[in-house]
């Protein structure tokens, strides 16, 4: 799970479905089992407190966005609100956020089913991940080893952000793909940018074995 502190009051979490399952939660549970969804949420809050010393005291605003490979959860602490929320109010707020994200996921699932009619069931579509800190790319490169040496990677710079375009080869095992994506998600966030947009407006910095080149130059 990646934790990004946006400002003093707002924190973003990025967690893959692979990571969610490793934590003992079935993918469907977080959408349809209120208690299990709340357990995952508070587990994420506790981890943020332990890793980043972030305190979630006060009323919370929660937004959950579903991506094909995982979830983005934005939590804002409303410091200027005097009244605190009780557990039932917070639970209702969290439930609403999860319900909205579940609707997003339903659309993604339907699109995925259409994609499967045109491609191999275990073939993952290319995707982009991003960060605003190049140090995240450097830190990630030190952990990748040869994991990504056979992947078609491209690193772009666009509007003060770095975008990694990943194209998984057809012959790559699904388990290896999931492990690779789980590692990437510790440092990068899912992006909605497309390769044509990045090709046209972004600046290509590195391609091929991107992480080996980053280790070489940095």
From Swiss-Prot:
Protein family membership: Belongs to the MecA family.
Organism: Exiguobacterium sp. (strain ATCC BAA-1283 / AT1b)
Gene it is expressed from: mecA
Entry protein name: Adapter protein MecA
Function of the protein: Enables the recognition and targeting of unfolded and aggregated proteins to the ClpC protease or to other proteins involved in proteolysis.
GO MF annotations, alphabetized: protein-macromolecule adaptor activity
Domain notes from UniProt: The N-terminal domain probably binds unfolded/aggregated proteins; the C-terminal domain interacts with ClpC.
InterPro entries: MecA_C_sf, Neg-reg_MecA
One Pfam short name: MecA
Oligomeric and partner information: Homodimer.
Domain of life per record: Bacteria
């Amino acid at each position: 799970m990646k934790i990004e502190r946006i400002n003093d009051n707002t924190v973003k979490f990025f967690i893959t479905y692979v990571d969610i399952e490793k934590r003992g939660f079935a993918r469907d549970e977080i959408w349809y089992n209120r208690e299990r969804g709340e357990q995952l949420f508070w587990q994420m809050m506790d981890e943020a407190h332990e890793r980043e010393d972030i305190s979630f005291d006060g009323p919370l605003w929660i937004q959950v966005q579903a991506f094909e490979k995982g979830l983005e959860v934005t939590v804002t602490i409303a410091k200027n609100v005097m009244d605190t929320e009780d557990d039932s109010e917070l639970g209702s707020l969290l439930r609403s956020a999860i319900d909205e994200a579940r609707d997003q996921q339903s659309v993604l699932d339907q699109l995925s089913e259409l994609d499967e009619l045109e491609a191999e069931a275990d073939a993952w579509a290319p995707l982009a991940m991003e960060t605003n800190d190049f140090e995240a790319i450097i830190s990630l490169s030190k952990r990748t080893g040869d994991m990504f040496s056979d992947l078609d990677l491209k690193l772009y710079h666009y509007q003060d952000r770095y975008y990694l375009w990943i194209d998984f080869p057809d012959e790559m095992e699904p388990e290896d793909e999931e492990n690779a994506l789980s590692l990437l998600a510790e440092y990068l966030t899912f992006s909605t940018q497309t390769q044509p947009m990045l090709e046209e407006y972004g600046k290509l910095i590195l391609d091929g074995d991107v992480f080996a080149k980053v280790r070489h130059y940095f």
